[in-house]
Amino acid sequence: MNSMRVRIALVLVAGLTGSAAFAEDGVTDGKIIFGQVAALTGPAQDLGQGMRQGILAAFGEANRSGGVNGRILELKSRDDGYEPEKTVEATKASLEEDKVFALIGAVGTPTSKAGQPIATGAKVPFIGPFTGAEFLRNPYNRYVVNLRSSYFEETEAWIDHLTKDLGISRIAILYQDDAFGLTGLEGVQKAMAKRNISLVASGSFRRNTVAIKSALLDIMKAQPEAVVTVAPYKPVAQF
């Protein structure tokens, strides 16, 4: 996670820890305990591990300056392997066993979709998930703190650049066949519909795999001028 974004989150946390409206689990006179549920193993582990290291770096910086409101920040991470079923188990354990004040640094749309309702149900802040999914933005949820643009905003920027700046209209998409990929697909389709154009081809693949040969063949048959991708890094690298 970008350290500047974490610092912004910490400013918000400073306000939350002083508010009786939020849960007090994980807050003592000396520290604030955060939980992270993310992919620390498996094909998406680079995302989860990178997020964890970024949070730890930002927490370390804050702690060297005295923490937040005089409290040292602590992170307890749990692995979900980028599988929603494991996210549910790990999120419940984080709340019930680790007694965290807030969850931070979730990775992925399907996993956030599994974990966020549990956090919200417990009135626990859900901070900085690595996803631009709409369900975290609409309707407004006071327990969700987003630190990135939505997928719809991002896909609009892609298509605007391709069509306006590069003059490209024959566009295909490679996407992961889950909540993450389907939301990105919807965003691309919306952006293209605004310009009266449509995808010339699409290819999809299952989560937690790099088996994208079939998707590649489907896309290449259409001879697109550009391919946009809504997928983790490793499958895109294979593509």
Regions found by a protein language model. Name each.
Residues Q36, M51, A58, A90, ...:
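Hydrophobic alpha-helical segments typical of transmembrane helices
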Residues L40, G81, D177:
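Residue-level signal for short, function-critical loop segments
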Residues V27, K31-I33, D46-Q53, E61, ...:
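Beta-alpha junction/loop-to-helix N-cap segments that form part of ligand/metal-binding clefts
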Residues G35-P43:
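Acidic/histidine-rich, surface-exposed loop or edge segments in extracytoplasmic proteins
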Residues V37, I127-P129, S150:
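Generic beta-structure capping elements
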Residues K86-E89, A133-F135, R142-F239:
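Extracellular/periplasmic Venus flytrap/periplasmic-binding protein
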Residues M1-I33:
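Short, low-complexity disordered leader/linker segments with a strong preference
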Residues A57, E61, S65, A93, ...:
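Solvent-exposed, charged/polar functional surfaces in cytosolic regulatory/catalytic domains
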